[in-house]
Amino acid sequence: MARGPRYKVPFRRRREGLTNYRKRRRLILSRKPRLVVRKTNKHIIAQVVVAKPQGDVTIVGVDTRALAKFGWRGDENNTSAAYLLGLVAGYKARLRGVREAVLDIGLHRPVAGSRVFAVLKGALDAGLEIPHGEEVLPEDDRVSGKHVAEYAAKLKEENPELYKARFSRYLQRGVQPEDLPKHFEEVKKKIVEHYEAKLAKAVAQ
């Protein structure tokens, strides 16, 4: 309830927990495209957005479902998928002429090593220039899913039934979770080769 003559009713999107307008203003004043990262219960979304007087214009929009094109059969909402998504988004942005951006994680908490920063790491590796601190980026072992593989291997030995239940989605897709780092590297290689070829072709034209 509003109280007192100086009380200001927050904007609707702020009341609904959708937009931090102070942070958004700082990002817009940077005059750089924004790498917008959002999470849902099942997927992760990355967009490269430019602020215009008439409203935001989305230059690139992609989510982790697009990774299936490159053979990804792992979870679509984990750290590995987040990194690969950032890699794809970064390359797509470069193909559209974007060279630099600022990270926009909205109301997500800025937890070092989290999935939103895995997207950032992927975009950086794709060649985008984005201001950041190295301490927020997840370690390579975590990005590749090594921690998942180690846990899966241990669980498979100690409790095969729980292993099958916990990793049923991986197994249904034909991926042994203990082989996740290898699968990750294979998909990463496909993405890099695909977009590097496109970039080379664009330069040659």
UniProtKB/Swiss-Prot annotation:
Matches recorded under InterPro entries: Rbsml_uL18_euk
Superkingdom, taxonomy of origin: Archaea
Assigned GO CC terms: cytosolic large ribosomal subunit
Keyword rRNA-binding: yes
UniProt cross-references to CDD domains, sorted A to Z: Ribosomal_L18_L5e
One Pfam assignment: Ribosomal_L5e
Keyword field: Ribonucleoprotein, Ribosomal protein, RNA-binding, rRNA-binding
GO molecular function: 5S rRNA binding; structural constituent of ribosome
GO biological process per UniProt: ribosomal large subunit assembly; translation
Function: This is one of the proteins that bind and probably mediate the attachment of the 5S RNA into the large ribosomal subunit, where it forms part of the central protuberance.
Protein family according to the UniProt entry: Belongs to the universal ribosomal protein uL18 family.
The protein's assembly and partners: Part of the 50S ribosomal subunit. Contacts the 5S and 23S rRNAs.
Name of the molecule in the record: Large ribosomal subunit protein uL18
